[in-house]
């Protein structure tokens, strides 16, 4: 494959003077949004070519420099299942730990949790789903059985004073079951919250959701779980990620997952774009007058760095618009 020409980020003209649009007809938007950067874990885990440990460490350090307050760093899963995450201990120990920044890691089981804690993890994440078929095909058990597995992690985490974040996959649709009942999403979310997850991220795993579906799902979940404990994780498969995120913001959600450069494809839709690009999210939020604490220019540099390392173009529209290829 021919080497890509190096992309040179241009300085964003007038970013600091972006005027907040009128939000009178949009409902009350949060004044501040916490962005959970998932690129180093969710974005890289399905890359076919192994990304070197130094590159992963530099990416995370650059994201820290950009001001992201939460950076999901790696996954303590067996290298047999996810070879890309085989260097999890080296990555977690090798990154600079910036004051005020959290570096959670994914721990699918108790063994992974114990390894993560031994490596210095202060926060972990667990993955559930609102679809029985997805759960069966993904981790070979029922939703109820998955809760039993999570219970061991949550009890160990409580004893070790480790915070646990929960994920609910297929919140807006499933590759196997199709439509998912909002009541089912609410049920699974409520269970994770009652078990001790301080925050639950509701994921549109295959990116089929629309703002209308997002509104219906969140309305059901918000009846069971405090709004402050909810986050959204949108995929852009059908170009709906920003629209769905905006709907969630209008409903009061103030925590959003995203991935630098839009890293992370949708494994169930061949060739489809994956995670919401952090650059695009930050640009939208800044334009709405919502504080993020993120330096967009430094974020663009981090995205450019990892795209060069992967020899691919960015999926971020903002990065595409502000770079000379």
From Swiss-Prot:
Transit peptide: 1-27
InterPro entries linked to this entry: Aldolase_TIM, HMG_CoA_lyase_AS, HMGL, PYR_CT
Active site residues per record: 266
GO function term, MF aspect, one: hydroxymethylglutaryl-CoA lyase activity
Keyword annotations: Acetylation, Disulfide bond, Lipid metabolism, Lyase, Metal-binding, Mitochondrion, Peroxisome, Transit peptide
Cellular compartments annotated: Mitochondrion matrix; Peroxisome
UniProt-annotated binding residues for substrate: 41
GO CC annotation: mitochondrial matrix; peroxisome
Root EC class: lyase
Keyword RNA-binding: no
A Pfam match: HMGL-like
Record pathway: Metabolic intermediate metabolism; (S)-3-hydroxy-3-methylglutaryl-CoA degradation; acetoacetate from (S)-3-hydroxy-3-methylglutaryl-CoA: step 1/1
EC annotation from Swiss-Prot or TrEMBL: 4.1.3.4
Residues modified as N6-acetyllysine: 48, 111, 137, 179, 324
Binding site for a divalent metal cation: 42, 233, 235, 275
Pyruvate carboxyltransferase domain sequence ranges: 33-300
Biological processes, Gene Ontology terms: ketone body biosynthetic process; L-leucine catabolic process
Residues that bear N6-succinyllysine: 48, 137, 179
Residue ranges of the motif Microbody targeting signal: 323-325
Record flagged with keyword Ubl conjugation: no
Assembly description: Homodimer; disulfide-linked. Can also form homotetramers.
PANTHER family in alphabetical order: HYDROXYMETHYLGLUTARYL-COA LYASE, HYDROXYMETHYLGLUTARYL-COA LYASE, MITOCHONDRIAL
Family indicated by similarity: Belongs to the HMG-CoA lyase family.
Protein name: Hydroxymethylglutaryl-CoA lyase, mitochondrial
Gene designation: HMGCL
């Amino acid at each position: 494959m021919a080497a890509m020409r190096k992309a040179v980020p241009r300085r964003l003209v007038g970013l600091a003077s972006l005027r907040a649009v009128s939000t009178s007809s949009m409902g009350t938007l949060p004044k501040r949004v916490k962005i959970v950067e998932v690129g180093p874990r969710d974005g890289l885990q399905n890359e076919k070519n192994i990304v070197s440990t130094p590159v992963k460490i530099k990416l995370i350090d650059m994201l820290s420099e950009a001001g992201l307050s939460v950076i999901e760093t790696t996954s303590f899963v067996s290298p047999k299942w996810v070879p890309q995450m085989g260097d999890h201990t080296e990555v977690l120990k090798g990154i600079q730990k910036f004051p005020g920044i959290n570096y959670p890691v994914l721990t699918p089981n108790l063994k992974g949790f114990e390894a993560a804690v031994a490596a210095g993890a202060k926060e972990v994440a667990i993955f559930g789903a609102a679809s029985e078929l997805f759960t069966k095909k993904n981790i070979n058990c029922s939703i109820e059985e998955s809760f039993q597995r999570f219970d061991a992690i949550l009890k160990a985490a409580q004893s070790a004073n480790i915070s646990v974040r929960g994920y609910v996959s297929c919140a807006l649709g499933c590759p196997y079951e199709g439509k998912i009942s909002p009541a089912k999403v609410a049920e699974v979310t409520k269970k994770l919250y009652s078990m001790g997850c301080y925050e639950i991220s509701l994921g549109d795993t295959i990116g089929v959701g629309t703002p209308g579906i997002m509104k219906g799902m969140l309305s059901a979940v918000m009846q069971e779980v405090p709004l402050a404990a909810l986050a959204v994780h949108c995929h852009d498969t059908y170009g709906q990620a920003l629209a769905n995120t905006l709907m969630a913001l209008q409903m009061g959600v103030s925590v959003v997952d995203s991935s630098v450069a839009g890293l992370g494809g949708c494994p169930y839709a061949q060739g489809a774009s994956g995670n919401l690009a952090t650059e695009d999210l930050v640009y939208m939020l800044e334009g709405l007058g919502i504080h993020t604490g993120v330096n967009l220019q430094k974020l663009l540099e981090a995205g450019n760095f990892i795209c060069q390392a992967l020899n691919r173009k960015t999926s971020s529209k903002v990065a595409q618009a502000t770079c000379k290829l």
